[in-house]
């Protein structure tokens, strides 16, 4: 099936008892066992079924199947936020003494997790420029558990050469984890370009309406964990916390996502509310239609800003003179690369503040991927915790303004930008 069809139908058919067409909200904490033996079999992973909503939930299961189908994975795990998805993906395979290698240009929350939180838990993160594959490969050693990048960077809008980075990681027996939040599977399916694990903030484009937090981890099922037993003991040796299970033996190709569910999620508990899942499923059904308008509007906004005398620079890989335009064309299927763009106003940070304060239609907030157009100044919000050196590494100059272009009529978006640019002088 095509992506548009999968987004509406994958993972669910009308309920056999009630014939309900909409996915039901299973607002329950727990599930009855048929017998003592049935309960024991569920806990031993001998039979499929539900035990407790922190681990599995029928509403969440539909969303997991649907996103896995859209990405082309063997399985997925829904969690409470995009940050939980990133954290759990790493904790599934990394422990004290391990390291991961990451691009330096990242969403501010991810950078903070990598630069400050994970190191305090004994996991080192090594940063390199997103466009220097050789530098990233040189950082991989015997303790490296993963390479991490964003398919489209937030807020810089940079494009990573996914296939080249995947090849570099695989030469050392290391998986590539890709945050595909900004591109979504409508524009880019990282598994088709060598990635092994995909993470999403469902909060953004997949939910699409700024009403619910959610995250997703998707497993390609292609990485040969069992061939790298020394590098990945957490998947290849008995787990005393779960009846001595060996995940590569019990789950086969789904070993990663299996452990992600029964260890990080079960033990730390960032479970996704089934009510949030219901809202996200509603958004997901129209993802392809919305992304078409998001991208069309963003391309027009970028072209408008590029010719405006009050604008110093524009970063959007959909522009033909952008140095990463060809990469965007390759990995986004020839479509505009999503709807996140950044620019600087002549007059620096003070002019940028006047611009943001003058906006009337475009909302001042730090989310992205909403149906509504949004603007923020990352250096004073999402990346506020970074010092000047870290801001430079993250590709966030102090005059950068990030726009998340919505699905409103383009004339109204441009009119608001025009009057705000005039007010910024």
Predicted regions and their residues:
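PLP-dependent enzyme catalytic core of the Aspartate aminotransferase-like
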Residues: 1, 97, 115, 142, ...
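Glycine-centered tight turns that cap/initiate beta-strands
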Residues: 72, 143, 310-313, 361, ...
């Amino acid at each position: 099936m095509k992506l548009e069809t999968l987004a509406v139908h994958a993972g669910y058919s009308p309920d056999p008892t009630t014939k309900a067409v909409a996915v039901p909200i299973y607002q329950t904490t727990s599930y009855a066992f048929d017998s003592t033996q049935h309960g024991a079999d569920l806990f031993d992973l001998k039979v499929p079924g539900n035990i407790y909503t922190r681990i599995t939930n029928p509403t969440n299961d539909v969303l997991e199947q649907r996103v896995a189908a859209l990405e082309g994975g063997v399985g997925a795990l829904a969690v409470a936020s995009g940050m939980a998805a990133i954290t759990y993906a790493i904790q599934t395979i990394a422990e004290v003494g391990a390291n991961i290698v990451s691009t330096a240009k990242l969403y501010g929350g991810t950078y903070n997790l990598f630069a400050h939180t994970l190191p305090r838990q004994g996991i080192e993160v090594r940063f390199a420029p997103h466009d220097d594959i050789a530098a990233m490969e040189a950082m991989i050693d015997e303790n490296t558990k993963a390479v991490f990048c964003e398919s489209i960077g937030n807020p810089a809008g940079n494009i990573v050469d996914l296939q080249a980075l995947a090849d570099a990681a695989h030469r050392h027996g290391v998986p590539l984890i890709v945050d595909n939040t900004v591109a979504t599977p409508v524009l880019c399916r990282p598994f088709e370009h060598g990635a092994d694990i995909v993470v999403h903030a469902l909060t953004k484009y997949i939910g699409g309406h700024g009403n619910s937090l959610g995250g997703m981890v998707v497993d390609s099922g292609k990485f040969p964990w069992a061939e790298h037993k020394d590098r990945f003991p957490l998947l290849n040796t008995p787990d005393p916390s779960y009846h001595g299970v060996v995940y590569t033996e019990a789950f086969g190709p789904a070993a990663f996502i299996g452990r992600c569910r029964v260890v990080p999620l079960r033990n730390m508990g960032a479970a996704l509310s089934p009510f949030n899942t219901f809202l996200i499923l509603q958004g997901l059904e129209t993802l392809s239609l919305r992304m078409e308008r998001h991208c069309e509007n963003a391309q027009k906004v970028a072209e408008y800003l590029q010719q405006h005398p009050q604008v110093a620079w524009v970063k959007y890989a959909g522009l033909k003179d952008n140095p990463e335009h060809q990469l965007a064309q390759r990995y986004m299927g020839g479509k505009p690369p999503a709807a996140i763009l950044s620019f600087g106003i002549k007059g620096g940070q003070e002019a940028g503040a006047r611009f943001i304060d003058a906006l009337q239609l475009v909302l001042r907030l730090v989310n992205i991927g909403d149906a509504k157009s949004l603007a923020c100044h990352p250096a004073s919000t999402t990346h506020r915790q970074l010092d000047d050196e870290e801001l430079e590494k993250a590709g966030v100059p102090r005059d950068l303004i990030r726009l998340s272009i919505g699905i409103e009529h383009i004339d109204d978006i441009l009119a608001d930008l025009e009057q705000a640019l005039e007010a910024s002088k």
